[in-house]
Every structure is written in C-alpha cells, then in structure tokens.
C-alpha cells in the first residue's frame, strides 16, 4: 500500500498496551516505570518502521507525533495524539454512565500543551477544510437503550469537559468546515457532532467519520446487533456498520465526500469490494448528506 500512496500515520493504544492512558497500563500489577520501558521500546520500533519526520525521533518513552499537514488552501490536517498525554480513564473504564470524574475539568485527552497547539492552529488555518485525524470517537454515543445511559469511558465522553471545550471552540471560533476522523473500535460510523448532546435538536458544529479495521475482528456484520435501538437513542449517528474495509475521501473546495468501502467477509479470499454508504459535506454546512 505504501508503494502506491503516501501515508500519514499515528498510533492508538495497541502499539504498546490496550486502552493505555499516559504512563498507566491497563494490565494490573504493571508499574509506571515498567510500562515506560515497554513504551520506549515500542516507540523506537514504531519510528523505525513508519514514515515519520525526524522531529518525531523518540527520546526514551517520549515521542512527539502530533503535527499538522497543509494541502495548500484546500485542507489542513491536524494529526493528534490522544494516548500519550491523557489522564486515566474515569469511572473504572468500560461502558458507564458519566460519573463526576468523567465530567471534571481535571480529565484530559490531549494535555494542555497539545490542546493549545491545536486551538492556535485552527485559529490561524487558511484552509477550506480542517480535519482532525485522531484516535477515538468524539460523539457522545449512548450504548444503552432506554432511560439508562452508558458511554465509552475510553472515548471522548470519558473526558466530557474537554470534549465540550473542543466543540465549543469549533463553534465559537467559526472553524472552517471541521471534519473529525477516528478509528479504534473496528467499525464504521458517520456522525454529526452537535453543539449540545443534552439537546439532541441542537446545531451540528462538525462532522465525524470513524473508520473500521481492515481485517481485525473477523468478518463483521453489515447491521450490528442492536442497530435500530442505537440509532433511535442517538439521532446524530447517521450510519453505523461493522464490516471490514476502509474509508475513502474525495475533497474539493465545494464538497467533502466520504465513501465507506467494505467487504462481506475476510475469513476467505475473494470477497467483492463495495461502497456500503457515502456521505457528502458541503462547504459551510456541517451536516451529513447521503450521496
């Protein structure tokens, strides 16, 4: 693939430890010192095998991977790191209601320095489209049907104060055409990021596309279990699919088109490739239109 197209890479968690946060391992009994030794080795291996700038050269267990890439006046990509600087997942991690810890200002996904860098970059970007290429879903998706609520504490809803801070910034600073990207959860999503997730009728201030895995997780499903209930609970979710595949985008000054390319199976050769869904975002309108 790299012989055919250029790569812009970033990591998530499995390069070093599932659901890691800062210097905290998910595994019980692993000290911060031991985890940082593992992280230093993982960073070195990552740097040696990925196309990265020299500025990303690791220094022991530290590696500066967040950066921006400019494609003229058309698009600016802000590649974030939401693992290395985050605080521990609140509420014991997992799918939980938002406990006070998840709502507190002390929790951070990006860390202060990266957050300020991002906000400065968005404020000064001359681009028509501003993309946030990062690790985990921003939309506050309720995974529990009915009156009870459950959100992923590993995703941005576990860091609700900073999540709201980000969306408020995009709205109040009138960031041009913000489009967020994520991965992590081996499934496809197309979301409208509304200003207030407590008011499901509030205005969308950005759009979000979550890309599936190429092969991890097996064959997957076109319609995940509980899809009808999930869409009813979360009307800002415009598409969800758990097949394997990739996301393809075509960007022009007038539109951003995203195609969800999937296959029905990966457990044997020969699966035909299809476009399962397509969405178009028009310049100046942060809503999703089915193509």
Label for each model-derived stretch:
Residues 1-291:
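Metal-dependent phosphoester/phosphodiester hydrolase catalytic core
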């Amino acid at each position: 693939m790299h012989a055919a197209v250029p790569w812009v890479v970033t990591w998530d968690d499995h390069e070093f430890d599932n659901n890691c946060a800062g210097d905290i391992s998910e595994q019980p009994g692993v000290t911060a010192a031991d985890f940082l030794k593992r992280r230093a080795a993982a960073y070195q291996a990552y740097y040696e095998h990925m196309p990265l700038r020299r500025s990303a050269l690791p220094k022991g267990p530290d590696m500066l991977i967040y950066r921006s890439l400019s494609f003229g006046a058309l698009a600016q990509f802000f590649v974030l790191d939401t693992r290395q600087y985050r605080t521990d997942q609140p509420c014991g991690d997992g799918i939980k209601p938002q406990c006070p810890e998840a709502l507190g200002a002390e929790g951070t996904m990006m860390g202060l320095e990266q957050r300020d860098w991002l906000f400065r970059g968005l404020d000064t970007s001359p681009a028509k489209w501003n993309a946030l290429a990062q690790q985990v879903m921003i939309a506050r998706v309720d995974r529990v049907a009915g009156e009870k609520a459950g959100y992923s504490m590993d995703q941005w809803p576990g860091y609700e104060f900073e999540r709201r801070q980000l969306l408020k910034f995009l709205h109040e600073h009138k960031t041009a055409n913000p489009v967020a990207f994520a991965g992590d959860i081996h499934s496809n999503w197309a979301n409208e990021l509304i200003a207030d997730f407590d008011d499901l009728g509030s205005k969308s201030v950005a759009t979000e596309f979550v890309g599936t895995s190429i092969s991890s997780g097996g064959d997957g499903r076109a319609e995940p279990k509980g899809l009808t209930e999930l869409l009813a609970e979360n009307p800002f979710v415009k598409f969800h699919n758990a097949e394997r595949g990739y996301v393809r985008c075509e960007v022009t000054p007038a539109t951003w088109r995203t195609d969800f390319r999937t296959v029905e199976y990966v457990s044997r050769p020969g699966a035909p490739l299809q476009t399962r869904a397509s969405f178009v975002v028009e310049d100046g309108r942060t809503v999703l239109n089915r193509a």
